[in-house]
Design a protein with these regions (language model features):
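Short, flexible coil/linker elements and helix-boundary hinge sites characteristic
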Residues: 2, 39, 100, 236, ...
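Core of folded catalytic or high-affinity ligand/protein-binding domains
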Residues: 86-90, 98, 103-241, 246, ...
Length: 285
């Protein structure tokens, strides 16, 4: 199907403009240097140069797997995966800092500059070498903020010090920055619906170790599959960023097949998950 060549981005005072969705060299070079330093093989067997057609049936099964995933922050395997995710996220952030791109966070009571479309961040980087991120403390899921969760039960809410313009950022703030940079904007993927989010998962997944990938998958393809193909699929198809019904925040890891971009469940697990999907379809009419 090929990667889209352009996207329409709203602009202040000029309506909307169509821009070519090219990779951003500074970010791509930072990603390559990081992987080389870490000894990570960028060619892990999955083609991320194109824009593969999304398998919606599989995405619905991933959504069901995310729903069934236990919120299990004290599980040693879960803890190890999230600790690896955080450590590697901070390493990726240091690599991004060297690009000279200004990493800003939205100040309280300030209009979000990408409110009309998150794709506006692409133009901001290309034109102004700036990326603005919505802080975790201002929104973390549907109708909740970071203050609604206990840090002891969510390692992503741990304070990691200064990130960009924020002195007391959380690990989740750092992950939001690097995922937008390395998953979306750097590869020329300023798309934030289901296909763009899955491609961001494929792009950014390459930069993580096997230890971190299960947690990274829960935070990306797990949550995004639930958002786009879970129980609120019909509502979210036309919802704005403010009205979208997001996935519940959980600290856990999905089955191995769900973290593998081409994996599929089978046997009793497939039947159990398909039953959940069928119930969603029935409820949505």
């Amino acid at each position: 199907t090929g990667r889209p060549l352009s996207t329409v981005i709203p602009t202040e005072g000029r309506g909307a403009v169509r821009v070519e969705a090219r990779p951003i060299a500074e970010i791509q070079n930072a990603a390559s240097r990081y992987m080389k330093e870490r000894g990570i093989d960028a060619g892990d067997g999955y083609d991320v140069t194109g824009y593969p057609e999304l398998n919606k049936d599989r995405a619905r099964l991933v959504a069901a797997a995310y729903q069934q995933m236990k919120d299990d922050p004290t599980n040693p395997a879960v803890r190890r995966a999230y600790e690896a995710l955080i450590e590697e996220t901070l390493g990726q952030l240091r690599a991004l800092d060297k690009t000279g791109i200004e990493l800003d966070f939205l100040a309280p009571n300030t209009p979000y500059p990408y409110g009309e479309s998150p794709a506006m961040g692409y133009g901001d980087i290309v034109t102004n070498k700036r990326l603005v991120t919505f802080p975790t403390r201002s929104g973390y899921g549907t109708g909740t903020t970071a203050d609604d969760f206990e840090v002891a039960n969510n390692p992503l809410l741990r304070n990691v010090g200064r990130v960009g313009t924020m002195d007391d950022a959380t690990a989740n703030d750092a992950f939001r920055v690097v995922h937008d940079a390395y998953g979306h904007f750097g590869p020329g993927n300023p798309f934030f619906r289901s296909k763009g989010e899955e491609r961001a998962f494929l792009e950014h997944r390459r930069m993580f170790s096997d230890d971190a990938r299960p947690a990274m998958a829960s935070e990306t393809t797990g949550q995004n599959s639930y958002l786009n193909y879970g129980p609120d699929e019909i509502f979210n198809t036309t919802a704005s960023g403010e009205t979208t019904k997001y996935a519940p925040q959980k600290i856990g890891i999905m089955p191995d097949w769900a973290t593998d971009p081409t994996g599929m469940p089978d046997g009793a697990e497939l039947r159990r998950l398909q039953k959940i999907v069928n119930e969603w379809r029935k409820a949505n009419g």
